[in-house]
């Protein structure tokens, strides 16, 4: 079975599934790194302990989504013709997921979709993911929902199962962040991810720490040698509830994103990566362009006026952060309000095994402790 990811959040959701499949030994997973920047996805799979079996290089400019999609279609076609998989598993609504689903359909290979978004009525929100998801839905044989109105492990409809978010089982590698993730899951702490290169974000974070005793901040994007160049950063890094994450340590960043209440950045790529991880995010209009180092799927097609940017002053950023922390519908809410459930990856494996005729029921039951719902 091919597990195809086109972004780091997609890799983070599929890596635990690959591990569960290998552990149970009845479905042979082959992880595939694709998308506009496949090496970034490749590195994410490796950092998460699941080295990709295949890395698909588009061979075209990664800033043109249409050309990337066309190149991926040819390469995925060759891959499926060579591998002849029993099924293809995709996550989210990126361009790689869209093309993988279409090519699998052309090859008459069942598509399994791990759907991590909310059901919305606006085709253009988020863009282009929502449109991509609707196309994928028409080609999908088995829907696996990370969240929904149904109860975990209950079949929500024909070939539709709520399994939980596989990202929630991911833990940071660093001991301090791993401890923070554990406390966040227990409801005794909340975490926020801040771009350490934006002074208004740092100032707002400093104020928020003083008024929110259960909040801890993870600063991303600056090395320890850069700290002394920014007085606000100097003060924050000495705070007992502040953690400095140098550059982009993938395992730590995705692991802490799995439990974070909000994120704030001035980079479009980090903004959308946070949103794809289910983290409510704030995009600050710092005037630096905000493009970031890595394009996300569809960036060249996006009307940037659609993104609700926050003014680059500490007061506006603080107001936006406080709003997310106090809004349960945004996913932050009071400590302990965000649900975390173990075993999602094994529920995905079980559902796939059922689709392939290896299980009688689509969801595990309490008689099988290795695969049962908690």
Residue ranges with predicted function:
Residues 112-127:
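A short, histidine- and acid-enriched strand-loop-helix "catalytic/donor-clamping" loop
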Residues 1-83:
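Glycosyltransferase specificity loop/lid
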Residues 89-91, 113-114, 143, 249-296:
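A donor-sugar binding/catalytic signature common to diverse glycosyltransferases
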Residues 167, 174-179, 318-319, 326-374:
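C-terminal amphipathic helix plus adjacent low-complexity
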Residues 42-45, 176, 181-262:
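Donor-nucleotide binding loops and adjacent catalytic segments primarily
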Residues 89-107:
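An aromatic- and histidine-rich active-site surface loop
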Residues 272, 276-327:
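Catalytic binding pocket for nucleotide-activated donors in carbohydrate/polymer assembly enzymes
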Residues 32-34, 38-39, 138-199:
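A nucleotide-sugar donor-handling region in carbohydrate enzymes
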């Amino acid at each position: 079975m091919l597990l195809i990811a086109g972004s780091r959040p997609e890799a983070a959701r599929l890596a635990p599934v690959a591990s569960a499949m290998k552990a149970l030994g009845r479905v042979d997973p082959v992880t595939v790194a694709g998308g506009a920047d496949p090496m970034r996805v490749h590195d994410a799979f490796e950092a998460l302990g699941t080295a990709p079996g295949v890395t698909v290089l588009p061979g075209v400019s990664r800033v043109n989504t249409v050309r990337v999609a066309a190149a991926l279609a040819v390469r995925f076609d060759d891959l499926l013709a060579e591998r002849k998989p029993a099924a293809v598993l995709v996550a989210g609504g990126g361009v790689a997921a869209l093309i993988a689903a279409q090519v699998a359909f052309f090859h008459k290979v069942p598509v399994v979709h791990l759907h991590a978004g909310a059901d919305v009525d606006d085709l253009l929100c988020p863009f282009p993911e929502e449109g991509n998801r609707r196309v994928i839905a028409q080609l999908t044989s088995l829907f696996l929902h990370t969240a929904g109105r149904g109860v975990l492990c209950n079949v929500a409809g024909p070939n539709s199962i709520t399994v939980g978010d596989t990202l929630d089982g991911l833990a940071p590698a660093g001991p301090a962040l791993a401890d923070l993730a554990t406390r966040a899951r227990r409801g005794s702490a909340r975490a926020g991810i801040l771009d350490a290169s934006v002074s208004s974000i740092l100032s707002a974070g400093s104020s928020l720490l003083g008024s929110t005793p259960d909040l801890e901040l993870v600063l991303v994007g600056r090395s320890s040698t850069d700290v002394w160049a920014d007085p606000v950063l100097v003060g924050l890094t000495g705070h007992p509830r502040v953690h400095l994450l140098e550059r982009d340590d993938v395992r730590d960043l995705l692991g802490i994103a799995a439990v974070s209440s909000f994120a704030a950045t001035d980079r479009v790529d980090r903004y959308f990566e946070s949103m794809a991880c289910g983290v409510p995010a704030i995009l600050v209009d710092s005037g630096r362009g905000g493009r970031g180092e890595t394009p996300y799927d569809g960036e060249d097609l996006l009307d940037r006026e659609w993104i609700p940017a926050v003014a680059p002053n500490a007061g506006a950023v603080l107001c936006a952060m406080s709003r997310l922390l106090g809004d349960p519908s945004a996913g932050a809410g009071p400590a302990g309000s965000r649900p975390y459930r173990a075993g999602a990856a094994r529920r995905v494996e079980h559902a796939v095994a059922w689709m392939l005729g290896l299980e009688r029921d689509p969801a595990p039951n309490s008689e099988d402790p290795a695969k049962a719902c908690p």
